[in-house]
Amino acid sequence: MESADVSAIFGTSPFRTARDLYYDKLNIASVEDDEGNWVAMEMGHLLEPLVAKIFERKTGYRVYQIKKMFQHPQYPWMLADVDYFVELPDGTTAILEIKTTNYNARDNWWMNGKETVPVYYESQGRHYMAVTDLDRCFFCCL
């Protein structure tokens, strides 16, 4: 189970249902394949390094990647493919999760007049923290 699966399991994901996840894990092709969204997904992947660089410049924190799949030591079914890590001034490490969105989804990042992380992304960050045993996760959204 990867971090993006958590919001589908909790029923908070606007992108996939628990049934989609079930079919995905069994390698069963989904009846309604989301081919129309491939451009947005590809742009998100292409923009990740730029967004990480923006975060690094704005915060002054060192940002780096470890390209591997992390696995929880006690629960091997818990996996995490972390976008980036952040070296904080006190020497500790945090997670940096990169998100890209569009103008129509901007309201998902606000609640009661305050900037917030959507619950479906928050669950992803919490999953990453559980797998990596880190206690801080930054989200940077473009």
PLM region spans:
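Charged, glycine-rich intrinsically disordered N-terminal tails and low-complexity linkers that flank
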Residues: M1-L46
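A generic secondary-structure signal marking the coil-to-beta-strand transition
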Residues: A18-D20, V51, T92-A94
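Nucleic-acid nuclease catalytic cores
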Residues: M41, R57-V82, E87-L142
